[in-house]
């Protein structure tokens, strides 16, 4: 026992240090195990909690899912709002111009400011109606009345008295404003329509409340039973009645053609009886409004005039235009007098307006593909062909010509055609020619019936009647195709009687034919060698100058004592026989078109043959190689360009008083420096560089030397024209 007892302490003593270490390590291990066991305990605890929740029926899980769904919905809503505000920020210029992205409130504030600026300040009325800021109330009223083609009136609902009426009442009903203002609307209506007006002016409830007449379908529609609300915002009214037509005169010039025809084309109820007023059908549309309007204070006199009315009818009255005019004179006025056609450069119809049926009698399909020259008079075909060639060269400018057109009834109608070309804006090539063809006779009749107010004076009254058509101006030009033909001169061969004047005024004697009728040997072969071309005869309504520059200079020469030259085409001497005045008198000048170009035919290289023998009806030799253009009964000697040059009066060696080329334009010295280079390139066969001075006093006033050159005054004003 003793041996065993000490052995135990000895072992324990021998293992003292190691045992201490072991015990300490055991303690550490126990602490570590406790730390590690804690998570296990927690996990178990969590698991036990979950299990306990499951055991409780899953109420907490539903709450958690509900919270998650609500958060997702809110997140989506915030994302959408952010996207819309970002898009709004991009649309507002003030927001997009900022350096940094503004917050949401700033974006909304700037958007509201931008919308107000677009809408305009102060344009919104109390009832929410909108009016553009750039229009005044008066301008807006006129625009509305013009668009509605009617008149505006305001009527008191209780008394039926007219409180206001616009000035457009006069062209619609031929009554003045004073006839309506202050009067009863019942007096202006047909007696049988009084009950209808009383029903429309009534503001009380009725069985027909909310019923509207639809004019398009002819049915009665019901708008609903919101009478109290509609009365506050304005109850709509629409009805048809018969109104009395007055006798106040209407000035046609103050109205356009459409309004004038519509006022003439009233839907009358048959011819009025003697002593009875005439009534027309008027469609009235408007609203019942409170009177006086909110915020408007009336004077005592105005308050007495409305007789205590609380409501008024604000309406627009428009004429019911019938499809069958009742007026007999409308049958002639409504007939079309013109139609539009489209042609190619050769004159073929590519499009025809439907009004051609009433104007010339043809259906559009009958004219398509045909050449307009085929329907023109044989004597006018060359004139029309030249007009098409000229309008092509004018490139967009309007050219007017009058010719005879073969109608469907095989009658010749005088047609005035105003044509211009349409160019491709990219290639600048001519696509087609657009013509407006007007029947002159129908146009004059319609202008007479309209009292001169139709067409806004497009065709002036200065044009002559059909049997007295004046001779159109035709010129003679040389081989120089770089200059435009003169439209103010006439070729002598165009007159059937060579004793007539070379230049005729615009009011020539009636019955003068434009082309020779008999003994016309002007063949195609001769035409091919003829270097003289005829320009397009313009319409008589072209603007005409009062005096030409040639007349002014001729008058100055007579005052200075310059002797007239008998060989000059501008002066009449003993060798020329004029039909009207005595020998030695000056012929009248043609004041029609392009007067500044009248001096072009005066140059010696373009000289016409001189007139020899007052009654011999013979012409001198032409100083060119052109084929002669015969006239009726005229004898022509053989052409010798140089042998008979002395008979022309323009020979530079034998003539003392001569007209230089472009003497008429000598009053424009500032242009001569610009034209020298161009005119030196124009080589004429008989150019005379040194000619005597004609108007020394004129040149002295213009500070010009006495010796000048023809080429100084060659001014190509108009584009070139080649036959």
From Swiss-Prot:
Annotated Low complexity bias: 670-680
InterPro entries, alphabetized: bHLH_dom (IPR011598), Circadian_TF (IPR050933), HLH_DNA-bd_sf (IPR036638), Nuc_translocat (IPR001067), PAC (IPR001610), PAS (IPR000014), PAS-like_dom_sf (IPR035965), PAS_fold (IPR013767)
GO biological process, one term: positive regulation of DNA-templated transcription
Region Disordered, residue ranges: 1-23, 487-509, 557-592, 670-694
Organ and tissue specificity: In day 23 embryos, expressed at highest levels in brain, spinal cord and epithelial cells of developing gill. Expressed at higher levels throughout all tissues in day 27 and 35 sac fry, predominantly in brain and spinal cord. In the adult, isoform 1 is widely expressed (at protein level) and is detected in liver, gill, gonad, brain, kidney, heart, spleen and muscle. Isoform 2 is expressed (at protein level) only in gills with highest expression in the epithelial cells surrounding the gill lamellae.
Record keyword Transcription present: yes
Biased composition (Polar residues): 557-570
Subcellular location: Nucleus
The organism's place on the tree of life at top rank: Eukaryota
PROSITE patterns in UniProt: BHLH, PAS
Pfam families from the UniProt entry: HLH, PAS, PAS_11
SUPFAM superfamilies in UniProt: HLH, helix-loop-helix DNA-binding domain, PYP-like sensor domain (PAS domain)
GO cellular component, one term: cytoplasm
Major place of residence: nucleus
Domain PAC, residue spans: 400-443
Annotated ranges, domain PAS: 137-208, 325-395
Domain bHLH intervals: 65-118
Keywords: Activator, DNA-binding, Nucleus, Repeat, Repressor, Transcription, Transcription regulation
Gene Ontology MF terms: aryl hydrocarbon receptor binding; DNA-binding transcription factor activity; protein heterodimerization activity; sequence-specific double-stranded DNA binding; transcription corepressor activity
Quaternary assembly: Efficient DNA-binding requires dimerization with another bHLH protein. Heterodimer with the aryl hydrocarbon receptor (AHR).
Domain statement: The C-terminal region of isoform 1 contains a transactivation domain. The Pro/Ser/Thr-rich region in the C-terminus of isoform 2 inhibits DNA-binding of ARNT-AHR dimers.
Protein's name according to its UniProt entry: Aryl hydrocarbon receptor nuclear translocator
The species this protein was found in: Oncorhynchus mykiss (Rainbow trout)
Gene: arnt
């Amino acid at each position: 026992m003793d041996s065993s007892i000490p052995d135990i302490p000895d072992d324990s003593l021998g293992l003292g240090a190691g045992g201490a270490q072991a015990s300490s390590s055991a303690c550490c291990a126990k602490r570590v195990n406790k730390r590690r066991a804690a998570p296990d305990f927690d996990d178990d605890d969590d698991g036990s909690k979950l299990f306990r929740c499951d055991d409780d029926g899953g109420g907490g899980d539903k709450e958690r899912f509900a919270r998650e769904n609500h958060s997702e919905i809110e997140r989506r809503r915030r994302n959408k709002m952010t996207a819309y505000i970002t898009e709004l920020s991009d649309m507002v210029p003030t927001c997009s111009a900022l350096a940094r992205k503004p917050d949401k409130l700033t974006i909304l504030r700037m958007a509201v400011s931008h919308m107000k600026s677009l809408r305009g300040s102060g344009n919104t009325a109390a009832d929410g109606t909108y009016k553009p800021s750039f229009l005044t109330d008066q301008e807006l009223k006129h625009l509305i009345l013009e668009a509605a083609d009617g008149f505006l009136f305001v009527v008191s609902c209780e008394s039926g008295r007219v409180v206001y009426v616009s000035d457009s009442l006069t062209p619609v009903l031929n009554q003045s404003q004073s006839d309506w203002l202050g009067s009863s609307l019942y007096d202006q209506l047909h007696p049988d329509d009084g009950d209808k007006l009383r029903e429309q002016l009534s503001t009380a409830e009725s069985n027909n409340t909310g019923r509207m007449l639809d004019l398009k379908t002819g049915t009665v529609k019901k708008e609903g039973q919101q009478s109290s609300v509609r009365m506050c915002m304005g109850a709509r009214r629409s009805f048809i009645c018969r109104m009395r037509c007055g006798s106040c005169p209407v000035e046609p010039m103050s109205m356009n053609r459409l309004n004038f025809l519509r006022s003439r084309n009233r839907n009358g109820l048959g011819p009025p009886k003697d002593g009875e007023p005439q009534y027309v059908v008027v469609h009235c549309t408007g609203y019942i409004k409170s009177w006086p309007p909110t915020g408007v204070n009336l004077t005592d006199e105005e308050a007495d005039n409305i007789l205590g009315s609380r409501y008024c009818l604000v309406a627009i009255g428009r004429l019911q235009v019938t499809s069958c005019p009742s007026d007999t004179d409308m049958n002639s006025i409504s007939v079309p007098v013109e139609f539009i056609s489209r042609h190619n450069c050769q004159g073929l119809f590519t499009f025809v307006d439907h009004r051609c049926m009433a104007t010339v009698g043809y259906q559009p399909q009958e004219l398509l593909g045909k050449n307009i020259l085929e329907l023109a008079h044989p004597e006018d075909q060359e004139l029309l062909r030249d007009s098409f060639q000229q309008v092509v060269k004018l490139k967009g400018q309007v050219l007017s010509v009058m010719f005879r057109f073969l109608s469907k009834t095989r009658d010749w109608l005088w047609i005035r055609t105003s044509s211009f070309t349409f160019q491709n804006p990219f290639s600048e090539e001519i696509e087609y020619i657009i013509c407006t063809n007007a029947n002159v006779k129908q146009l004059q009749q319609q202008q007479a019936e309209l009292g001169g107010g139709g067409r806004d004076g497009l065709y002036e009254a200065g044009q002559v009647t059909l049997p007295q058509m004046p001779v159109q101006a035709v010129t003679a030009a040389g081989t120089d195709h770089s200059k435009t033909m003169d439209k103010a001169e006439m070729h002598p061969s165009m007159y059937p009687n060579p004793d007539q004047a070379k230049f005729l005024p615009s009011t020539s004697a009636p019955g003068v034919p434009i082309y020779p009728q008999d003994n016309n040997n002007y063949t195609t072969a001769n035409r091919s060698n003829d270097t003289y071309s005829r320009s397009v005869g313009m319409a008589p309504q072209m603007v005409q100058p009062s005096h030409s520059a040639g007349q002014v200079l001729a008058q100055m020469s007579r005052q200075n004592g310059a002797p007239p030259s008998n060989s000059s085409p501008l002066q009449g001497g003993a060798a020329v026989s004029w039909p009207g005045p005595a020998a030695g008198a000056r012929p009248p000048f043609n004041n029609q078109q392009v007067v500044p170009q009248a001096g072009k035919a005066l140059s010696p290289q373009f000289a016409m043959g001189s007139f020899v023998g007052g009654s011999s009806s013979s012409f001198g030799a032409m100083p060119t190689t052109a084929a002669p253009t015969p006239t009726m009964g005229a004898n022509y000697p053989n052409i010798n360009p140089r042998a008979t040059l002395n008979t022309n009066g323009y020979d530079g060696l034998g003539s003392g008083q001569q007209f230089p080329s472009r003497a008429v334009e000598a009053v424009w010295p500032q242009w001569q420096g610009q034209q020298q280079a161009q005119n030196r390139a124009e080589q004429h066969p008989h150019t005379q560089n040194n000619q005597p001075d004609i108007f020394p006093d004129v040149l002295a006033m213009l500070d010009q030397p006495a010796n000048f050159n023809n080429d100084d005054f060659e001014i190509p004003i108009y584009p070139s024209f080649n036959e």
